[in-house]
């Protein structure tokens, strides 16, 4: 699954902070893992693409997408 959001560099730092504050891990090659969801960031100027590569089997792709959308609405205020 791939989702793209408009986001500033400052907000991207907030995203990374939120992941680590909620028990997630961010790796040096822009991969991340949080609560069984694995993926990677692709950052380009003011666009952030999140690619989800793995998820818990109980979580639907739609659920993951909805959570991402909710999070980015909140982070962009």
PLM feature spans:
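Short, surface-exposed beta-strand/loop "edge" segments at domain boundaries and coil↔beta transitions
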Residues: 37-41, 56-59
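A general marker of short, structured functional hotspots
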Residues: 1, 8, 23, 67-68
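C-terminal structural segments of small proteins and small subunits
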Residues: 48-77
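Terminal, regulation- and interaction-focused segments at domain boundaries
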Residues: 1-17
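Beta-strand elements of well-folded, non-transmembrane domains
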Residues: 7-11, 30, 54-56
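Ser/Thr-rich, low-complexity intrinsically disordered terminal regions
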Residues: 14-17, 21-40
């Amino acid at each position: 699954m791939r989702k793209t959001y408009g986001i500033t560099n400052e907000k991207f730092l907030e995203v990374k902070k939120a992941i680590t504050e909620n028990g997630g891990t961010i790796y040096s090659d822009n991969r991340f893992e949080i609560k069984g969801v694995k993926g990677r960031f692709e950052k380009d100027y003011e666009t952030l693409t999140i690619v989800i590569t793995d998820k818990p089997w109980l979580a639907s792709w739609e659920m993951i997408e909805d959570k991402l959308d909710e999070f980015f609405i909140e982070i962009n205020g």
